[in-house]
């Protein structure tokens, strides 16, 4: 119950946090996206509007410059008859500088929800970890898991409150709920899209080319793994900001499983040898 204490709830069950009985006459008002948390300011970073704060240190000409983040990645996800496949590269770059090649760009929100990272790593990690907290609070309050649609809507609402403040995030939220597998795209403008297949990051055009040529709804698990694997490998080969290893997850009815973490260089050599 430490999470409840952190969010301002006293010991014991709070009446307004409990599920409201339809005949009780009580009102259930979850607030913005914080599900009646007493201190929602915990979810809001303090300080000035970030873009204006940074511009205040420059001269008149520099204050008119658009702040641009230096980043790059390749992430993808698609639905098929056996669930959802999520595959990402692992290179973290800042322009031409490669910071590390061992970043897991999949945020494990809970056993039935996954989120991907594309854009500014700090923004993606912070907001998706906050989403994980909200999903946990939803479970504690309602006694059931949040749906994939509702989780993606929460993240979209968070982004809408910070539109124009310099956030950089393009995330895919995927999971399994009562309606089956779900896949949504959410970005820093609050855009929220549902679809069968998405790819984000600087290498997404190359990944889409591979996926479009081999995607079918009736893929077997092994065929789906191979399609996602090839899409990431060929994207990293053509996109200088992507690389490292292929981290792949399979979202099933009983939760996600991590399929593999394989070096893209080894896979590329394997594919080339197979064509000789």
Swiss-Prot record:
SUPFAM superfamilies recorded: N-terminal nucleophile aminohydrolases (Ntn hydrolases)
**Major enzyme class:** hydrolase
User: What subcellular compartments does it reside in?
Assistant: Cytoplasm; Nucleus
- Catalytic residues in the record: 73 (nucleophile)
Q: What is its EC number?
A: 3.4.25.1
Q: Does the keyword Manganese apply?
A: no
* Cleavage, annotated site positions: 72-73
What's a GO biological-process term for it?
fat cell differentiation
Q: Which Gene3D superfamilies match?
A: Glutamine Phosphoribosylpyrophosphate, subunit 1, domain 1
What is one Pfam family matched by this protein?
Proteasome
In its record, the post-translational modification comment is: Autocleaved. The resulting N-terminal Thr residue of the mature subunit is responsible for the nucleophile proteolytic activity.
- The set of disulfide-linked cysteines is none
Predominant location: cytoplasm
Induction summary: Up-regulated by interferon gamma (at protein level). Down-regulated by theophylline (THP), a reprotoxic agent thought to induce infertility.
The UniProt catalytic activity note for this protein reads: Cleavage of peptide bonds with very broad specificity
General function of this protein: The proteasome is a multicatalytic proteinase complex which is characterized by its ability to cleave peptides with Arg, Phe, Tyr, Leu, and Glu adjacent to the leaving group at neutral or slightly basic pH. The proteasome has an ATP-dependent proteolytic activity. This subunit is involved in antigen processing to generate class I binding peptides. May participate in the generation of spliced peptides resulting from the ligation of two separate proteasomal cleavage products that are not contiguous in the parental protein. Required for adipocyte differentiation.
What quaternary structure, including any partners, is listed in this protein's UniProt entry? Answer: The 26S proteasome consists of a 20S proteasome core and two 19S regulatory subunits. The 20S proteasome core is composed of 28 subunits that are arranged in four stacked rings, resulting in a barrel-shaped structure. The two end rings are each formed by seven alpha subunits, and the two central rings are each formed by seven beta subunits. The catalytic chamber with the active sites is on the inside of the barrel. Component of the immunoproteasome, where it displaces the equivalent housekeeping subunit PSMB5.
Q: Look up the further comments and give them.
A: Encoded in the MHC class II region.
Quote the protein name from its UniProt record. Proteasome subunit beta type-8
Give the species.
Answer: Rattus norvegicus (Rat)
Q: Coding gene?
A: Psmb8
């Amino acid at each position: 119950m430490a999470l409840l204490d952190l969010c301002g709830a006293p010991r014991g069950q709070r009446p307004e946090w409990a599920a409201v009985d339809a005949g009780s006459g009580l009102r259930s008002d979850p607030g913005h996206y914080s599900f009646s948390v007493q201190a929602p300011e915990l979810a809001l970073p303090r300080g000035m509007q970030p873009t204006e704060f940074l511009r205040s240190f420059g001269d008149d000409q520099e204050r008119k410059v658009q702040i641009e983040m230096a980043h790059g990645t390749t992430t993808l996800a698609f639905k098929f008859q056996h669930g959802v496949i999520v595959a990402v590269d692992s290179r973290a770059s800042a322009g031409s500088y490669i910071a590390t090649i061992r970043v897991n760009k999949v945020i494990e929100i809970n056993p039935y929800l996954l989120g991907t990272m594309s854009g500014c790593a700090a923004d993606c990690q912070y907001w998706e970890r906050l989403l994980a907290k909200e999903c946990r609070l939803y479970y504690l309050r309602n006694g059931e898991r949040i749906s994939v649609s509702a989780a993606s809507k929460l993240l979209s609402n968070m982004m809408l409150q910070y539109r124009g403040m310099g956030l950089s995030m393009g995330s895919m939220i995927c999971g399994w709920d009562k309606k089956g597998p779900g896949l949504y795209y959410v970005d820093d403008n609050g855009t929220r899209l549902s679809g069968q297949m998405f790819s984000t990051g600087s290498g997404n055009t190359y990944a889409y080319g591979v996926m479009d040529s081999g995607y079918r709804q009736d893929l077997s698990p092994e065929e789906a793994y191979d399609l996602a694997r090839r899409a990431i490998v060929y994207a990293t080969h053509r996109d200088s900001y992507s690389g490292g290893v292929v981290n792949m997850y399979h979202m099933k009815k009983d939760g996600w499983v991590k399929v593999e973490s394989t070096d893209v260089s080894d896979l590329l050599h394997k594919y080339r040898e197979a064509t000789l």
